[in-house]
Amino acid sequence: MGLIIDTSIIIALERGKVSTKQWSHYGQAYISPIVLTELLIGVDRVNNENKRIKCLAFIEYVKSLFTILPFGIEEVYTYARIINDLYKQRITIGTHDMLIAATAITHGYSLLTLNVKDFKRIQGLEVLTVSSKD
């Protein structure tokens, strides 16, 4: 059994609001390269150099903690299906979320997120969540 970790969980992990222990019972945890992209976009938006260095160090930690799954041709086909399914239902979801979902569906893994509302609308995706310390 495997689990894809969404960006919302990674950000909560960085902020100390969740712990890897909360999902360790699901087995191997992975991230999509899109999650890494979102994290790097966030780093590029940081103006404070010290904070930027901390963010980059955290990204290196994330890369060591999780296997980054590939995004290849199978994921592309799944992504296209997701777009078409949502279009037929007149549902709009962020591009990155659909790409992350495509990675999870293609590999047959559940998705762990704090953004349940959007991901629940994607057919064929098992969505899981954990409680976050606020």
Curated annotation (Swiss-Prot):
The protein's matches in InterPro entries, at most eight in alphabetical order, are given as: PIN-like_dom_sf (IPR029060), PIN_dom (IPR002716), Type_II_TA_system_RNase (IPR050556), VapC_family (IPR022907)
Source organism superkingdom: Bacteria
Q: EC?
A: 3.1.-.-
Every copy of the PINc domain together lies at 4-123
Q: Does the keyword Acetylation apply?
A: no
Q: Which cofactor does it need?
A: Mg(2+)
List of residues binding Mg(2+): 6, 97
A GO molecular function term, named singly, is: RNA nuclease activity
Question: Could you tell me which Pfam families the record lists for this protein?
Answer: PIN
Which keywords fit this entry according to its UniProt record?
A: Hydrolase, Magnesium, Metal-binding, Nuclease, Toxin-antitoxin system
What family is it from?
Belongs to the PINc/VapC protein family.
Q: What does this protein do?
A: Toxic component of a type II toxin-antitoxin (TA) system. Has ssRNase activity. Upon expression in E.coli inhibits growth in liquid culture; this toxic effect is neutralized by coexpression with cognate antitoxin VapB1. Its RNase activity is partially inhibited in vitro by VapB1.
Under what name is this protein listed? Ribonuclease VapC1
Organism expressing this protein natively: Rickettsia felis (strain ATCC VR-1525 / URRWXCal2)
Instruction: Tell me the organism's taxonomic lineage.
Output: Bacteria, Pseudomonadati, Pseudomonadota, Alphaproteobacteria, Rickettsiales
What gene name is given for the protein in this entry? vapC1
